[in-house]
């Protein structure tokens, strides 16, 4: 319960407070994290945002900024691998009322690296999903995430993050990148695997 409350607080701060204009200014250099049209990409934090996370003394969330045109809604889905196929295990769907929308997605994780919560900030609202920690523990684990800008194609899922857990210390882990894991679940040999995707829906 403590982790769940902390995750909810962190998600609210990350998305409601930190989105701002999405323009980034760093020491000695000036860059922008504003994504291009119909693009989702890893966010770059301002110094103020980084200082806020340090003040909270929590693990830094994984952040993505996006810009999308012509979408009627979005769907965030959490999948768990079962018998070589991805099975839905949670998610959230919301409408989009703006023809040209910019926003930010924040993912938080537990001490063992597993998914703990997600927040979606766009316009004036923030939606959140929190997940209680799994009771089973893994001896080793690995995770991967989307590292480069990705073109948003309406009605096609975009894999943002993948997690792999092993129950035996001697087991080797092949940590596929999220896009490969989404398309090739039958190749995953880990004892446990989880995947998060986002899909922007076309109008009509």
Write out the residue ranges for each language-model feature:
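Mature, Sec-exported extracytoplasmic domains of Gram-positive
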Residues: 26-204
């Amino acid at each position: 319960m403590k982790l769940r409350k902390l995750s909810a607080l962190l998600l609210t701060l990350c998305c409601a407070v930190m989105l701002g204009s999405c323009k980034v200014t760093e020491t000695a250099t000036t860059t922008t994290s504003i994504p291009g049209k119909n693009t989702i990409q890893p966010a770059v934090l301002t110094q103020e945002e980084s200082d806020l996370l340090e003040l909270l003394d929590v693990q830094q969330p994984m952040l993505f900024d996006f810009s999308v045109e012509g979408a009627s809604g979005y769907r965030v889905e959490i999948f768990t691998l079962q018998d070589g196929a991805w099975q839905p295990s949670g998610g959230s769907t919301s409408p989009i009322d703006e023809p040209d929308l910019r926003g930010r997605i924040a993912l938080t994780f537990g001490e063992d690296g597993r998914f703990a919560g997600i927040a979606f900030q766009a316009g004036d609202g923030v939606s959140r999903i929190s997940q209680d920690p799994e009771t089973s523990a893994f001896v080793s684990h690995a995770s991967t995430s989307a590292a480069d800008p990705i073109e948003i194609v309406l009605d096609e899922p975009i894999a943002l993050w993948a997690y792999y857990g092993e129950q035996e210390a001697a087991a080797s882990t092949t940590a596929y990148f999220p896009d490969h894991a989404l398309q090739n679940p039958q190749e995953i040999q880990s004892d446990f695997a989880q995947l998060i995707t986002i899909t922007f829906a076309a109008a009509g």
